[in-house]
A protein has these predicted regions:
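HotDog/MaoC-like acyl-thioester-processing domains
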Residues: 1-19, 99-157
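Generic structural detector for well-ordered beta-strands
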Residues: 24-28, 94, 140-142
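Residue-level detector of alpha-helical recognition elements and their boundaries
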Residues: 35, 52, 88, 92, ...
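Terminal targeting signals and extreme-terminal segments of soluble enzymes
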Residues: 37, 73, 79, 156-157
């Protein structure tokens, strides 16, 4: 299946954010994504790569790496909310259910709290497949300020 191109980059500055702002990303997990993630990370657990092995597990089929699914959250943070220039500080992850090859993951990131004196945002993060939450948690990010010297660390695209 051909994936649509990634959404254009968008930088939001701390001053642009408000509690409740939300961004979403939909991604269908391809077998090639899982193989590529295994090659990139070195995690070659056969539950991800071997249909024969996976068939003998409780999942009955190959599943995506949990951190592959979590990396889709990073895609939202780095490209849309807040976008380029934001720096990850921390991330909690709760893995609730497996993600299988062919599943479409819907990633939702919502601004939950803003700390003005440090230009930090707490973001509620959730991944769903077919209406079921498969991963949730929260992220803290440092967000560029429009009032900082040099103003724009990256251009708005």
């Amino acid at each position: 299946m051909i994936q649509p191109p990634l959404p254009p980059l968008r930088t939001l500055f701390f001053e642009d954010l408000s509690v409740g702002m939300t961004e979403r990303l939909n991604k269908t997990v391809a077998a090639s994504d899982v193989v590529g993630f295994a090659q990139l990370t070195g995690d070659r657990n056969p539950i991800h790569l071997s249909e024969h092995f996976a068939a003998k597990t409780s999942f009955r089929t190959r599943i995506a790496h949990g951190l592959y699914t979590a990396s889709l959250i990073s895609a939202v943070l780095g490209t849309r909310l807040p976008g380029p220039g934001a720096v990850y500080i921390s991330q909690t992850l709760n893995f609730r259910a497996p993600v299988k090859i062919g599943d479409t993951v819907i990633v939702t990131v919502t601004v939950a709290e803003l700390v003005a004196e440090k230009c930090r945002a707490r973001l509620a993060c959730q991944c769903e497949v077919g209406g079921e939450v498969v991963l949730d948690g929260e992220a803290w990010v440092k967000v560029p300020s429009e009032n900082a010297k040099g103003k724009r660390p990256v251009p708005r695209l």
